[in-house]
Amino acid sequence: MDAYEKIYQLYHLIKTKTAADLPGPYKVGVDLGTADVVLVVTDESGNPVAGSMRWASVVKDGLVVDFRGAMVIVEKLKAEVEAIMGITLDKGATAIPPGTVGRNALACGHVIAGAGLEPVCQVDEPVAAAKALDISHGIVVDIGGGTTGIAVLKNGELVFTADEPTGGTHVSLVLAGAYKIPFEEAEILKRDPARHRKIMPVILPVIEKMATVVKNMLAGYDEFNEYPVYVVGGTAYLQGFETEFGKAFGRKVHVPPHPLLVTPLGIAMFG
Ligand code: ATP
């Protein structure tokens, strides 16, 4: 299965609440995000076996702010996937935005440990995304709910990472302000593809700001100018995002299918 087939397969398994008939041992990854929590199981080769996700507000700007809430959600996702697969999951990997340090960096591990998964590894989110996309040479931009992180890979080695607190939450805040609606309503409006064409003019400045943030992160690194650029994270679902982000960034960018699932799939591959 190539990288995109794996992503489509994971989406299908989550949507149908089913498991792929693949033999173990299995790897588990948990993505504790600003907007959602995703648990993914893969086989040894990184083929998706099962997964589950929930919208949640337990993380802010990449940091766990509701420890107990996060733990309860991971417990539920774990129980759901265990029921689907008919086995017990006992360990897993987590990820953090690049540059997260100290106790904040430890929090994700504590959350999954509290939910019954021994933490085996903690990776940078865009590094996990690069793994899922099977990229050994290129720039991965991960635009989540609260943060925009990048990872640059050269010959399979991670040579640069950076992170900024700008993400889909800011898109929703702008929509909430423009339409004078609560944030939660703006989130729902934003996730409706039928409304994307209409909201694009309102949110375009935020997308342009994100592209500028990434451009600034890479300023002075001319050697990366020819590297392919992949954008993942839920914000990249916005119709027209690929074109508008690319225009503002000044380079062609690629958005894989189901961009929200790329990082969680990659985290599991480290499990
Ligand atoms: P972070 O990595 O910053 O902690 P996260 O892991 O929660 O956040 P993702 O799950 O990649 O980030 O993306 C969540 C963001 O994507 C949210 O802002 C959410 O509103 C947005 N999003 C999700 N689905 C869609 C959609 N269909 N259209 C537009 N935006 C979407």
Predicted feature locations:
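Nucleotide/phosphate-binding catalytic cleft detector across ATP-hydrolyzing
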Residues: M1-T34, V38-I143, E157-G271
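Short glycine-rich anion-binding loops that position phosphate/pyrophosphate groups of nucleotides
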Residues: G146
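A cytosolic small-molecule/anion-sensing beta-strand core signal
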Residues: K154
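A structural feature that tracks compact, well-ordered secondary-structure segments
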Residues: G149-A151
